[in-house]
C-alpha cells in the first residue's frame, strides 16, 4: 500500500459510526521533515516547526511554553503521551501527532469531529505502523 493510500483510506476516511465526519487534514511525515504523503488540505509547514515538534517528542514539555506551530497556526499543547503522542487545541479544533519509529502521523480536526475521534484515527494508524516496524 502506498503512503498516500494510508492517508486517504485510514486518516481522511469517515469516522466509524459518524458518516460524513472526517479529519480536516492529515499527513505522514518522516522524522527528517520529508512529507511521505498528505491530504490536499494539509498546511505547508516550516522546517523549524517540524524541528520543534521532534524536539518535544525527545524532550517532553518543550512546546508547552510556546505552543505547537504548524503552517503558521498555533495550537495550545494539551495532555499527550510523553515521547509518543502530542495533542494540541485551537478553538473548536485541534491536532494529534503520533510518533512511530520512522515517521510522524498528523491529524487535524474541526468540529463536529471531537478530540477523542481524532486521537483514535491517528493513534490507530500510528500503532499499526509501529507494529510493522515503521
Swiss-Prot record:
It comes from the Eukaryota. The modification Phosphothreonine is found at residue 114. It comes from Olea europaea. GO terms for cellular component: cell cortex; cytoskeleton. This is Profilin-3. A motif (Involved in PIP2 interaction) lies at residues 84-100. Phosphorylated by MAP kinases. It holds the Pfam family Profilin. Disulfide bonds join 13-118. PROSITE patterns: PROFILIN. Its main location: cytoplasm. Belongs to the profilin family. Keywords: Actin-binding, Allergen, Cytoplasm, Cytoskeleton, Disulfide bond, Phosphoprotein. One of its GO terms (molecular function) is actin monomer binding. It is found in: Cytoplasm, Cytoskeleton. Gene3D superfamilies: Dynein light chain 2a, cytoplasmic. Binds to actin and affects the structure of the cytoskeleton. At high concentrations, profilin prevents the polymerization of actin, whereas it enhances it at low concentrations.
Amino acid at each position: 500500500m502506498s503512503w498516500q493510500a494510508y492517508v486517504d483510506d485510514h486518516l481522511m476516511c469517515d469516522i466509524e459510526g459518524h458518516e460524513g465526519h472526517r479529519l480536516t487534514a492529515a499527513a505522514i511525515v518522516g522524522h527528517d521533515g520529508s512529507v511521505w504523503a498528505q491530504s490536499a488540505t494539509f498546511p505547508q509547514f516550516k522546517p523549524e516547526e517540524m524541528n520543534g515538534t521532534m524536539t518535544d517528542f525527545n524532550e517532553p514539555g518543550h512546546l508547552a511554553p510556546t505552543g505547537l506551530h504548524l503552517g503558521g497556526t498555533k495550537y495550545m499543547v494539551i495532555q499527550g503521551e510523553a515521547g509518543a503522542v502530542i495533542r494540541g487545541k485551537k478553538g473548536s479544533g485541534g491536532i494529534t501527532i503520533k510518533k512511530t519509529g520512522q515517521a510522524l502521523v498528523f491529524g487535524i480536526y474541526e468540529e463536529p469531529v471531537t478530540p477523542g475521534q481524532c486521537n483514535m484515527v491517528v493513534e490507530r494508524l500510528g500503532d499499526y505502523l509501529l507494529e510493522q516496524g515503521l
